[in-house]
Amino acid sequence: MPLMDVHWLIYVAFGAWLCSYVIHVLSSSSTVKVPVVGYRSVFEPTWLLRLRFVWEGGSIIGQGYNKFKDSIFQVRKLGTDIVIIPPNYIDEVRKLSQDKTRSVEPFINDFAGQYTRGMVFLQSDLQNRVIQQRLTPKLVSLTKVMKEELDYALTKEMPDMKNDEWVEVDISSIMVRLISRISARVFLGPEHCRNQEWLTTTAEYSESLFITGFILRVVPHILRPFIAPLLPSYRTLLRNVSSGRRVIGDIIRSQQGDGNEDILSWMRDAATGEEKQIDNIAQRMLILSLASIHTTAMTMTHAMYDLCACPEYIEPLRDEVKSVVGASGWDKTALNRFHKLDSFLKESQRFNPVFLLTFNRIYHQSMTLSDGTNIPSGTRIAVPSHAMLQDSAHVPGPTPPTEFDGFRYSKIRSDSNYAQKYLFSMTDSSNMAFGYGKYACPGRFYASNEMKLTLAILLLQFEFKLPDGKGRPRNITIDSDMIPDPRARLCVRKRSLRDE
């Protein structure tokens, strides 16, 4: 047999084995004895259901919630099965101790943390300690700092506009750049926040991580060491990591003494043992930047789309901002008095959450729930938070949950009995967009302030509208994530004195 034919047979044999192996992996399933949703028929293979979940995840989860609202079910997605816990089980589940569940591990699994450099988050919770103990208590004093950087960012990132000219913009990209600059100020302080290498690295890192993680999710573990180096996104990610370590290392070595009020300095102060290593700190800073920039930017983009689709909210929101700022300027309490703006962001998030499933956990001990359901060790669970927020049982106010009511929550909070409830940053067993319990998103208070500040300044300085003849851009659902359409555009013009 000619040598070429032998090589061809080897390639065919390897390809056939690889296909069969991938199908075998995609066809495997968990041992949890609860209903599975999503199959079109009894004849549909599991591997096809897992693939369909990529673009039909939202409808599959919604179907399961509507059918099994008060009982447990599961969905099959690429890489894992997820047991979906209904609201009436949440308090029982959340009381489990950290040694039984891991909240960060699902993220590491979804995005191939071994290759995307996310494993550092499994080593300790340094980043959470810093956010909870240092950042959150300082939020009121950071308002003016964040506003200073936002004012500067707008001069760099918004297009030049003349007179009454409307300019079409990619608001999604603008939001990423604005939030990147504000976050860099809080993360690195005034001396280093405009480091272009860091700004570029954090923007690229998130994109390369998501692409690499998503591709490797469908690759069997045994083949990942061989496939990962072939991916352009993985090579970009490695460059991003190297760049991030270099920037953070240079900053750490240049800093003298203590007293800096930024996350990097707080992280250095709080670190113990191996946490003190520069590479360790740099990697945590990169992942924190990813979390703080891109989820916030997507939430803000959704809010801008909603605002332009419902322009009747623009003037009431602008009037509120002008009233608060006119009374006392951008003092420490200004953001807390934006009640309508807070409500609008919360309602926008209710319709357009970044994550359809929250409260993600992986159990590392087998346990039995009160109804007798056994949860084996290694099981992943989540809550259908988006589906819940379309259910009248979990959405307050007289307006039906299917209708967008931007002031839904501010109207309820006008009653003094509910003044401190239904805030954008608050979580409870009915609204888990930011998670719930001890392991709710630790940065949600910072993110809330950042978004309220950004939207308030945009309302004061600019006019926005949808392009003529266009409706609100449709969301894109990928797996269990919901993203604003990055191809959509908005029209913007600078406000003038005559607009006052």
Swiss-Prot record:
Glycosylation site positions: N240, N475
Q: What is its EC number?
A: 1.14.14.86
Ranges annotated as spanning the membrane = 6-26
Membrane topology is:
Single-pass membrane protein
One GO CC term on file: membrane
The Swiss-Prot or TrEMBL record lists the needed cofactor(s) as: heme
Cite the annotated pathway. Plant hormone biosynthesis; gibberellin biosynthesis
Q: Which InterPro entries match?
A: Cyt_P450, Cyt_P450_E_grp-I, Cyt_P450_sf
- The name this protein goes by in its record: Ent-kaurene oxidase P450-4
Reaction catalysed by this chain? ent-kaur-16-ene + 3 reduced [NADPH--hemoprotein reductase] + 3 O2 = ent-kaur-16-en-19-oate + 3 oxidized [NADPH--hemoprotein reductase] + 4 H2O + 4 H(+)
Which is a GO BP term held by this UniProt record? gibberellin biosynthetic process
User: Which keywords are on file for this protein?
Assistant: Glycoprotein, Heme, Iron, Membrane, Metal-binding, Monooxygenase, NADP, Oxidoreductase, Transmembrane, Transmembrane helix
Q: What induces it?
A: Highly expressed under conditions of Gibberellins (GAs) production, whereas the transcript level is very low in the growth phase.
The superkingdom listed in its UniProt entry is Eukaryota
Q: What does this protein do?
A: Ent-kaurene oxidase; part of the gene cluster that mediates the biosynthesis of gibberellins (GAs), diterpenoids that may provide a selective advantage during infection of the preferred host plant, rice. Gibberellins (GAs) are diterpenoids and are synthesized via the mevalonate pathway. Biosynthesis of the major metabolite GA3 (gibberellic acid) from geranylgeranyl diphosphate (GGPP) requires 13 steps.
Family, according to the entry, reads as follows: Belongs to the cytochrome P450 family.
Quote the disruption phenotype from the UniProt entry. Impairs the production of gibberellins (GAs) and contains ent-kaurene as the only intermediate in the GA biosynthesis pathway.
Signal sequence interval, chain numbering? none
Task: Please tell me the species this chain comes from.
Answer: Gibberella fujikuroi (strain CBS 195.34 / IMI 58289 / NRRL A-6831) (Bakanae and foot rot disease fungus)
* Cellular localisation: Membrane
One GO MF term: heme binding
| Binding-site positions, heme | C441
